[in-house]
């Protein structure tokens, strides 16, 4: 009949502009304030949604807070309707609605007439919201389990702020390193700013200024790995010494996390990949959100973990770093997990895959994560003793490596992996089985594993 035809690709300027914006408020503004058809459509549905939400306040809830929370908790919105309205500017958008002949609820007009132009307001560490019933601002009564870093920072608790990370005093002798990447604020890839801030925080603990630390923030994802552009640039320019130095800097930092004088509690959530896993694993304890998608995925880009990830997986496979390695089965499982770049689909699965330890804490409500991590850090700080440096790691050695090589050869013959995949697998097997020095009767130490890990990483980075 000719009625069917291929779908035309539609492009709107407002979407392009919004995509380039970094934070949610700027994205929403870009979508609503443009002059193309896409923006007009977005404003139309947004204006109707905001007015509808305002009209429902006294019907389905006594306050705006529970409506916002219902949309966030029940429907996965990043912000509730009244939080969105604040982002857009209440007075500005209300004037626009009135000029377009829309009927704005009277309680919003009364709020604006009172001199208040936002539904929520933060002052001196306290958050208030406008109550239509009382026709005045009301203090937001947060649960003692909740901890909002942005709210806490209004109390002048930021010790130092860098481009991508900040040091924050959480109170009670606990320090926090918060990530806020300026390059990719949703993925938070590791850069030198992260490493410098973590090292500075550990220095402050070692000097006795703080007794414990939390590694965590409240962004979209914990950390999606290293800055691959930097590694690629060094590799393209054959700057192997600089690349090796960068990897060693990361390794040294993760070892400092492991052996710090005070306990460090990591709080991973959502995407926690590659280098993000390597930051989390050496901590004294982890308080993970139930929805944590964790994995060492370096094999996917032709590398192996380079920031200590192999060492952590070995220690985790040895049941928390103690006891003798069983006849290679545990390392074989680790080899499969890292070699196939398996990503846990939950914090519980991350325990099963060996990314997390069995005694790590899992929480369902992310609003409770920082407070839970802080409480755990305080508990651990009592008579805290750093772990013992391991010089007694008994790994499978050449015998175990041969078995892994045979498995790789079988995968290659079946067409499941390429020649280069096989090469990556052999490098990974070399590290996990303890290189040339290891064997069931010969022990290796932690630094040796880190050294051969770094050598393998740089070697693979040089492959074309």
Residue spans for each PLM region:
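N-terminal glycine-rich phosphate-binding loop for ADP-containing cofactors
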Residues: 1-220, 229-249, 255-262, 269-272, ...
């Amino acid at each position: 009949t000719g009625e069917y035809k291929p779908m035309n690709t539609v492009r709107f300027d407002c979407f392009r502009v919004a995509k380039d914006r970094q934070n949610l408020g700027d994205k929403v503004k870009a979508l609503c304030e443009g002059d193309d058809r896409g923006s007009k459509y977005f404003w139309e549905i947004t204006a109707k949604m905001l007015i509808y939400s305002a009209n429902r306040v006294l019907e389905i809830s006594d306050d705006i807070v529970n409506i916002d929370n219902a949309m966030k908790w029940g429907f996965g919105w990043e912000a509730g309707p009244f939080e969105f309205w604040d982002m857009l500017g209440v007075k500005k958008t209300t004037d626009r609605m009135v000029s377009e002949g829309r009927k704005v609820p009277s309680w919003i007009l009364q709020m604006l007439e009172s001199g208040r132009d936002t539904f929520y307001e933060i002052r001196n560490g306290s958050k208030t919201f406008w109550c239509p019933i009382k026709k005045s601002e009301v203090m937001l009564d947060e649960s003692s389990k909740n901890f909002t870093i942005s709210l806490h920072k209004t109390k002048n608790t930021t010790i130092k702020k860098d481009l991508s990370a900040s040091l924050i005093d959480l109170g009670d002798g606990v320090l926090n390193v918060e990530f806020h990447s300026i390059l990719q604020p949703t993925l938070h890839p590791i850069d030198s700013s992260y490493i410098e801030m973590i090292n500075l925080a550990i220095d402050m603990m070692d000097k006795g200024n703080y007794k414990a630390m939390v590694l965590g923030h409240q962004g979209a994802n914990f950390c999606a790995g290293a800055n691959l552009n930097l590694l690629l640039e060094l590799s393209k320019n054959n700057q192997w010494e600089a690349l090796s130095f960068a990897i060693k800097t990361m390794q040294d930092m993760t070892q400092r996390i492991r052996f710090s004088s005070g306990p460090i509690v990591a709080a991973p959530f959502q995407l926690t990949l590659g280098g993000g896993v390597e930051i989390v694993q050496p901590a004294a304890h982890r308080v993970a959100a139930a929805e944590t998608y964790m994995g060492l995925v370096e094999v996917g880009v032709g590398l192996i973990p380079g920031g200590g990830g192999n060492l952590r997986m070995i220690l985790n496979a040895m049941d928390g770093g103690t006891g003798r390695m069983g006849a290679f089965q545990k390392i074989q499982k680790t080899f499969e997990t890292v070699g196939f770049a398996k990503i846990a689909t939950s914090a519980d699965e991350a325990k099963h895959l060996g990314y997390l330890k069995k005694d790590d804490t899992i929480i369902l409500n992310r609003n409770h994560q920082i407070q839970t991590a802080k409480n755990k850090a305080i508990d651990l700080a009592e008579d805290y003793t750093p772990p013992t440096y391991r010089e007694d790691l008994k790994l499978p050695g050449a015998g175990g490596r041969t078995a892994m090589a045979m498995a790789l050869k079988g995968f290659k013959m079946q067409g499941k992996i390429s020649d280069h995949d096989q090469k990556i697998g052999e490098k990974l097997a070399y590290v996990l089985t303890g290189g040339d020095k290891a064997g069931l009767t010969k022990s290796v130490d932690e630094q040796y594993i880190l050294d051969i890990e770094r050598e393998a990483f740089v070697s693979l980075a040089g492959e074309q």
